[in-house]
Amino acid sequence: MGASVQLSSHSAAFEAPDHIGMTPRLSLRNITKRYPGITANDHVSLDIAPGEVLAILGENGAGKSTLMKIIYGAARPDEGEISFDGHPLGVETPAQARELGIAMVHQHFALFDTLSVTENVALGLSTGISAAEIEREIRLLGEKYGLEVDPASVVMELSMGERQRVEILRALMTKPKLLILDEPTSVLTPQAVRKLFKTLHQLSSEGVSILFISHKLDEIRELADRCVVLRAGKVVASVDPKAESEENLARLMIGNDPPTVREGSAKAGEVVFEMRHVSAPGSTRVCGIDNVSLAVRAGEIVGIAGISGNGQARFMAAASGEYLCEADRVLLFNSPVGELDTHARRISGLRYVPEQRLGHAAVPELSLTANTYLTGDSLVRSGFILRDRARSFANLVIERFHVKTPNAEKAAGSLSGGNLQKFIMGREILNRPRVLLVHQPTWGVDVGAAAVIRNSLIRLRDDGAAIIVVSEEIDELFEISDRIAVMYRGALSPAVPKTTISIEEVGRWMSGLWPDSPFTQKTSEAH
C-alpha cells in the first residue's frame, strides 16, 4: 500500500554524528509564508536526516502548523526552497506529497464524519486496494501499535481519542519516509502515548524521518533527537532536548520564564449542580453512561479522568442538555432541568466547552466576533445582534487570553488550534457562568496558555462557580481539581478529595478498579 520504506541500520535513538555527510531527508531554506496582517513563517531553515526524530517547539501561533502544511503540500510558501532526498520538492497538493512518501497526522482531524474508518483510510491510499484488505491492515496495525479501532465504525460516533488513532493509522498505512505529527498525543492516555512512542522509535530505526509538534515538554525530551524552537515565525534555537530542562525549553519557547498555576484551596458552598442516576444509551460503537450520579458545589472544581471513549461524551451531553432525560435526573440550583436543552440551561447559568473545537464549539467559517453570538445571550436583544458589544467582547477575550490573531474579524478556522482553544475558553469564562462544564480545557495548548486557562478556571472557582473538568491529562486534574472522579465503561467512580488519592490510584481506577465499583464486584463474583 503506497511506496515501501527502505530499511536502514540506524538505531531508534538518533545520534547526530551518525548522519554527518548524509543527504538530508528534508531540507528547508528560508521558507517564508505571509497572511494578511501576519508573517506565519519568517525565513525558516532546517534539515532532518533519515531516521531522525525532530521536534518543532513553539507557542500557539508561532508558525509550526503552517510550516508543516507547506511541507505536506497543503500551503505554498511565498519564498524559500525545499528539497526531499536531495531533489527539489514542489508539491502542490497533499496527494502529491503522499506519493513521494510524506504523511501527516493533523491536529484538527482531516476525517469525514459520515464515513467509516475503513472509508476514511481508503481516501489516503492508492486505488485498487479492496475494502477487505484495508480492514485487515487496520486491525493488524492497530494490534501491533496499540491503536485498536473498529474499521466499521462511523467517525462521527468515535471519541476524539479514537479519531486520533484513525489519523495515525491512515498515515502509517502509506508507509511514509517522512511522518509529520501535529500534536499527536493531545487526546491519548499515558499508556497510549507510551505505545505510540514505541511505534515511532521503531519507525525511526527503519529510516523513517519524524517531524513531531508537541507542547508537552516531557514528551519532547523523551522522544526527540533534536528540537528546533520557533518564536514569532522564526527559528530561535536548535537544541538537544535531553540536555535541557523543561524550564529551559519553556523559556526558549516563550522568551521569558514560564507562568505558574497559582495554588489555592476551595471554599465549597451549597450543591448547585447534580446528576441523579442518569443513564444515556450508547450504541455498538459509542459508550453510553449507566446510573451516573454526581453533586458539585459552588466554589469547587471536580475533575473527571478516564481513557477516551469510556462515556465522557455521553456524560457531558447529559450534563449540558445535548441529551435530554427525565426532569428530576439533573438539578441546577435545585431546579429540575433534565428536560431542558443547552440554551435553556445556559440562560439558567450553566455553560459548556465541548471537546471538539471546530464545528461544535466554534463555526470555522464565521469570524471570532460572530462566534461570540453562539453563546453570548447578552449580545442579542429582542432578536437583534448588538454588533458593537459583540466586537468589544471578542476583543476582550483576545486581550485577556492572549489570542494571537490580527483582529476579531478573522475566521475562527484561520487560528491555530491552541489559539482557537484559548478563544473558546475565554468566551465562556468571561461570560461568568455559575456552573461550567469543560471537556479537554488545554488540548493542544502551549505551556504559557495552559497556565492562563488553568488560572482562569481557579479564579472562576474562587468567585463561587461550580466547575466540572473532563480531561485525559491526569497531571492537569491534580493541578486544578478539588475532587477527582474517574469514568470507566460508562460508570462514574466516587469523586474524592485529590489529597486522598495518588496518581497511581487514579491510574488503577481508570481500569474500573475503584472500591465497590461494579467491575470489582463482578471480578470478585467470578472468583
List each language-model region with its residue ranges.
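Glycine-rich phosphate-binding loops of nucleotide-dependent enzymes
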Residues: 2-527
